[in-house]
Regions:
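Conserved catalytic cores of phosphodiester-cleaving nucleases, focusing on short active-site segments
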Residues: 39-43, 50-60, 109
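A short acidic (Asp/Glu
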Residues: 64-66, 110, 136-145
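Short, solvent-exposed loop/turn segments at secondary-structure junctions
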Residues: 18-20, 46, 57-61, 132-136
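Acidic, metal/cofactor-coordinating or nucleic-acid-engaging core segments within structured domains
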Residues: 59-127
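Polybasic (Lys/Arg-rich)
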Residues: 132, 141-190
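Active-site metal-binding core of divalent-cation-utilizing nuclease and nuclease-like domains
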Residues: 5-47
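Extended hydrophobic secondary-structure segments that form protein cores and membrane-embedded regions
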Residues: 53-55, 126-133
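Short, solvent-exposed loop/turn segments that connect beta-strands within catalytic domains
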Residues: 45-49, 119-122
Length: 190
């Protein structure tokens, strides 16, 4: 992001996680004890620099387990409480929805993007969560638990993968890719 600020896309994006999120566990890597984002796009609209974090979900299921512990509170509580995007829960951060999946992952991505903005690498961000329409349980969890905790809901959107990629329909250059994605992901969700 800081090497080529005019054009940027990254997969499994992580950025300054140790300094900004205190994610310094031994053996940490993207997705394991280290916040990562499936796709990060850097874009410009006028004079403004935008981040577009995209998290793809297909068949994941979660058990609703509270992941609150002292280390996570030390890392994330102050970021949640000072967040301009996330509401502070009425009964405090500990044992809140922010420590239950899928909100836990989305919270971490949100505070990482806020840190990128606060350190002037971008001006704002628009968060996308790609979930098949037929994955009711996951969509419902995000819609009913995470989205209500956002200060500005207009900067977070759930897309069905077919909807997101629909502009590519009919373009023969992408026929094989779309066929693969449909068979591999959204065609198989029950």
């Amino acid at each position: 992001i800081d090497e080529d600020p005019e054009s940027y896309i990254s997969f499994e994006f992580a950025f300054h996680n140790i300094e900004w999120l205190k994610e310094d566990d031994e053996g940490s890597r993207r997705g394991t004890m280290c916040t990562s984002i499936d796709v990060m796009i850097f874009a410009r609209k006028g004079n403004r620099k935008w981040l577009i974090p995209i998290e793809w979900k297909y068949t994941e299921t979660y058990n609703g387990k509270d992941k609150t512990n002292a280390k996570r509170m030390d890392r994330y509580a102050h970021l949640i409480e000072s967040s301009k995007r996330l509401k502070t829960p009425e009964h405090g951060v500990a044992h809140s929805i922010y420590f239950v999946e899928p909100s836990y992952e989305l919270m971490r991505q949100t505070v990482l993007c806020e840190q990128i903005v606060s350190h002037k690498f971008a001006d704002d961000f628009f968060h996308i969560n790609v979930i098949p329409r037929r994955h009711y349980e996951l969509r419902n969890a995000v819609e009913k638990e995470f989205i209500p905790m956002l200060e500005d809901k207009s900067k977070f959107k759930i897309f069905d993968p077919e909807e997101l990629l629909s502009p590519l329909n009919g373009n023969m250059a992408y026929d094989e890719l779309l066929k693969y994605l449909k068979e591999r992901y959204w065609g198989s969700v029950k």
